[in-house]
């Protein structure tokens, strides 16, 4: 029964991705290449391995994330991974310590603003967001209008549980981010990410 459920989740996600490319127009996938990003990357690669994948390099990521990004892109045959970086990081954060005094400003400078600029030429974007991740996402739809933008957000994994994601990774033998084994359930920038003690 679990394999059948996972099969239906996979096929459903693939259909959502296909519909996004067919109906929305110019669509990019956004990926952090984090703890479980490889699941959605695999599904997108199955549909179109030449599709644009936006990867925001905040220049504060773990070396392991950069290595994992290159490894996964190669493994899945992704040919259009676009590395996005902040243009003004050195100007606004010359010492690289903004995260210590104002983490929100650092995220805005290094992640949010560069991503929004990169997305400005797209009609929609594919995310890995799931309903189980927070209360505000409990009613997450597969397709949703982005706030204050004409873009459409596409959430092919909205119905997937954490267990579904893990089982899919095991069944398909997808490589895990190396920091997961070191106690990092979620992986972002090195200064702001800590392992969870069991």
Q: Which functions belong to the PLM regions below?
A:
Residues 1-198:
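Nucleotide-activated chemistry modules centered on ATP-dependent adenylation/adenylyltransferase
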């Amino acid at each position: 029964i679990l394999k059948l459920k996972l099969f239906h989740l996979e096929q459903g996600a693939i259909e959502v991705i296909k519909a996004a490319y067919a109906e929305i127009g110019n669509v990019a996938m956004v990926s952090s290449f984090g703890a479980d990003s490889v699941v959605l990357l695999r599904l997108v690669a199955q549909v179109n391995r030449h599709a644009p994948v936006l990867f925001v390099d905040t220049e504060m990521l773990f070396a392991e994330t950069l290595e994992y990004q290159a490894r996964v892109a190669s493994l899945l045959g992704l040919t259009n991974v676009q590395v996005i970086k902040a243009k003004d990081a050195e100007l606004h954060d010359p010492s690289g310590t903004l995260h210590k005094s104002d983490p929100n400003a650092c995220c805005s400078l290094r992640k949010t603003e560069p991503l929004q600029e990169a997305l400005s030429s797209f009609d929609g974007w594919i995310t890995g967001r799931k309903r189980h991740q927070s209360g505000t996402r409990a009613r997450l739809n597969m397709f949703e209008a982005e706030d204050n933008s004409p873009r459409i957000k596409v959430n092919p994994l909205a119905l997937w549980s954490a267990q579904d994601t893990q089982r899919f990774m095991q069944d398909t033998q997808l490589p895990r981010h190396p920091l997961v084994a070191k106690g990092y359930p979620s992986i972002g920038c090195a200064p702001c990410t800590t392992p969870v003690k069991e």
